[in-house]
Regions:
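Bacterial signal peptide processing site
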Residues: 17-21
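N-terminal "domain-start" segment that seeds a small globular fold
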Residues: 24-56
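Short active-site neighborhood of thiol/selenol oxidoreductases, capturing the structured segment around
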Residues: 57-77, 99, 189
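Structural microenvironment flanking redox-active thiols in thiol-disulfide oxidoreductases
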Residues: 77-125, 136-142
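Short, internal strand/loop/helix patches
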Residues: 119-156, 161-162
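Thiol-/selenol-based redox modules, centered on thioredoxin-like
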Residues: 154-220
Length: 220
């Protein structure tokens, strides 16, 4: 199984931040050329909150945002209670972006939902994602090396991973810290829409640990 680890973050950072030579040649590089080395996003299939199978492959040709969430996590609550996450979801989807929100909490752990609770999740949180995907085994979360909630990935229309990490630069659970925060996801989507390489392709994630079965056992 392929795993998207911090090595991918290193590749992303290298593409965005390669040092210039002391005597630089004239720049003729296109955005397409500068993204050629970006890692491919692993394809996966999960069942959504309505019981329908959704594959990442279905959205090839679209920009895709992946968000890991856990409604019991104070760091997630910070973004949802203020409506900030939902506002970003609406902005993105209005521009044609596919937004996949994933719950990787194991059964019996904080954030796990199924059945009617999963079907009611969007209305409960005023969510504006495209699909809510359920990952109770944690297989997809671990495939993407997601360790915290919230945790974000952005995939470009060619299926390349162009952003990995935290949603912003304020690693707190305080709503007031949203004011003036640098939202890396919004900035990355703006770069993509403008045809530019993503200026900040990796940011340190923060939040609650994702409740994989082995994570819960280790914390017990």
């Amino acid at each position: 199984m392929i795993r998207v680890t911090l090595a991918c973050a290193a590749v992303l950072a290298l593409v965005a931040c390669s040092p210039a030579s002391e005597t630089p040649e004239p720049k003729t590089e296109t955005a397409a050329a500068s993204t050629a080395a970006l890692p491919a996003a692993p394809v996966f299939t999960l069942v959504d909150s309505d019981g329908v199978q959704r594959s990442l492959a279905d959205f090839r040709g679209k920009t895709v945002v992946i968000e890991w969430t856990n409604e019991g996590c104070p760091y997630v609550q910070k973004h949802y209670s203020a409506g900030a996450m939902q506002a970003l979801q609406r902005e993105a989807t209005a521009d044609g972006v596919i937004w996949l929100t994933i719950i990787s909490s194991a059964p019996g752990t904080q954030g796990f939902v199924e059945g009617e609770a999963a079907r009611a999740f969007k209305a409960k949180h005023d969510g504006a994602w495209t699909h809510l995907l359920l990952d109770p085994t944690g297989q997809v979360g671990k495939l993407y090396d997601a360790k915290t909630t919230p945790n974000m990935r952005i995939i470009d229309p060619e299926g390349r991973l162009v952003y990995v990490g935290g949603i912003d630069d304020r690693p707190t659970n305080k709503v007031e810290d949203l004011q003036g925060a640098n939202n890396f996801v919004r900035a990355a989507l703006t770069d993509l829409e403008a045809g530019r390489p993503v200026a900040t392709p990796f940011a340190q994630p923060y939040g609650c640990s994702i409740k994989y079965p082995e994570t819960v056992e280790a914390e017990a």
